Amino acid sequence: MWGRLGAFLQQAVETREPTQDLLQSFIQHWKGVTQYYLETSDESCPARETDIPWRLRQLIDILVFEESNNGSQLSSGDEEDSGAGSHAGPCMEYLLQHKILETLCTLAKAEYPPGMRQQVLLFYSRLLAKVQRPLLHYLSVHRPVQKLIALAEDPVGATAQKEELQFLTAVCTKLEKDPSLLVHVLEEGSGSRVRCSGGEQDGETEARNHKPRQNLFKALLRLCTCQKGRLCVRAREALLRVLHSAQQEGPVHLIVQSKLSQYVTEHLCELHRCIPLSIHPCDITALQETDWRKDSGSQESDGMENAEAALQRFLCWVEYCDCLVRESHEVVAMEITRSIKEGYLQGILQPELLEVSELSILRSTAILTAVLHRFTATPLLRQFLTFLFGDERGPETRGDRGSQLRSQLIQRCNHLSDEISLASLRLFEEILQMPEEIALHSLVIRNLETRSYLAGGQDESRGQESETWDGAEELEEDPYFTDGFPDTGIRLPRSDNAHRTEPAGTEQWVKSFLSLVPEEIKSSDTGYDGYLQDAIVQYRACCQQVAQWGWPVSSKGTGHSQQEFYEGHFMEVLLGRLGGILDQPYDVNLQVTSLLSRLALFPHPNLQEYLLNPFITLAPGARSLFSVLVRVVADLAQRSLRVPDLQEMLLLVRRQLLANSANEQLNHVTLCRGAVVLEEFCKELAAAACVTHSPVGF
């Protein structure tokens, strides 16, 4: 209480002092700081127990009062004097001319008395935060600021991270308000000259004439990676604000010339290496919720917690890298992306992805899936997808597999290990959800653009209705459809409005998929209505995803190509997997059908024609999704003759799957589960055909 009263009285006295007395008071307090070093020989006394902290606070209070007093005089005086606002008072002039900041920086480096560095950091922080006039363009200010930033790596004395962050945050706040000042913090001191105004043009000239210092970014990134969660988050936010505000050519050039992108990538690689080899791949993909803004404390008690904490730190840094790219200038974003590609993708991840050990494959695939799940910045997505799949735009040929990495990732969807196949299929499911065309075009679209899957003699000008009924007659003659289109009890919506809005032929597309599985081997009498709502939601999401891709609204390509049709490596593997649905594990079947259903909902006319139109006439040697399903159903019909009571077994297996239990051991369980998945997949495709060719999809 008495201390506050004394401070109040002293402030009241100081407000009545004339300018000359204010300067004398400022000089007196500064001499009080220097006098300590002349009179005191006790080197063990901490700085906080001396009068140095109090005198430094008095210096700041005097400077703040002087500035506010000059501002009030300006507002009440002649407003035409535009230069008066930038005129420094006598106390500020004394601070600049007598190099007080340089002296304080020297005392901080010496760390005498103990804790002096913290006091100097606080003084700088308060000076930059409380004094409103620009200061960083002065040589006698930005040079000691540079030196104080560089002290972060000085082993002499232990700099408190809290005070250091407070100082760096104050510097970043000034840079955020005026990014042209960045040149005075990053430039080399040997070529610096005093400037009274940090204009944008001067900043750009300096940026090109001086090699940037690295201390600011190194200090910030060191705090960004510390174990104190709150300090870590504040440091990341400070760096993010600087990059977000630096949009002019000069600051952008300085940042690109700095080693910021290198430091970011190096820490990403370091965190990747810290992920224990013992961590299970499922734990990597299961960690869905991460946020770099949340505290990441270091309280870990056992090995498992250490592994999870290491993984979380890595994924949080991945998210932060994505945020840096999104918020930075385009040139800076491309530089960070390039560094991540060269340092992390090519240097760390690619060698792991190409390993042959099953555990290594599972681990690297899970990490890649988790990383891609967290990327939203366009430069990062494009760089990653181009790195994985290349930039070829022409159709694939059967003998050419492309890059080794692309070929390996696709082929692993059909790996001997079901676990690797599942992980690879989930990776591609993640990739297909990305708002970039690169992957989908490389995997599927480029092979369908010429429509060479169509027979050369097919009349493409005929209407949908004629095409539909001709195809229906062909199906009726198929030996696997001896009953034609049996009455399944399934009916499309029959309201007049719905009937008038559906294009001709859509109903026959739907019926074709619903009629694929014979009644004798069905395990459910429910229709495809349960899939319609999900199909509508997913179709709208797909339309939104591809809205900016410039896809055609109608099929293009003649269908007459001299080159043999090849569906591409990816579709070859998927259709091959679908062909083995009766002999594969249940989880693999679910993942394969999920991927194909997702592809069928993309609003590309050629893709929908190839996957959803049962009535196209295929070129010799070509296959479509429907033709593969016909063969699978034929195989199922043949096998059903050798399995007694198959329909009862199918009903029992369906109940077990719905209950997620397997209490009763059954024969032919893989076959029965495959048949159930096949039946439901046909319903999914029927819903997709209905939604994609009907206004209900919108």
From Swiss-Prot:
Transmembrane segments: none annotated. It comes from the Eukaryota. Pfam families: DUF5917, KELAA, RAI16-like. InterPro entries: FHIP, FHIP_C, FHIP_KELAA_motif. PANTHER family: FHF COMPLEX SUBUNIT HOOK-INTERACTING PROTEIN 2B, RAI16 PROTEIN-RELATED. Belongs to the FHIP family. This is FHF complex subunit HOOK-interacting protein 2B.
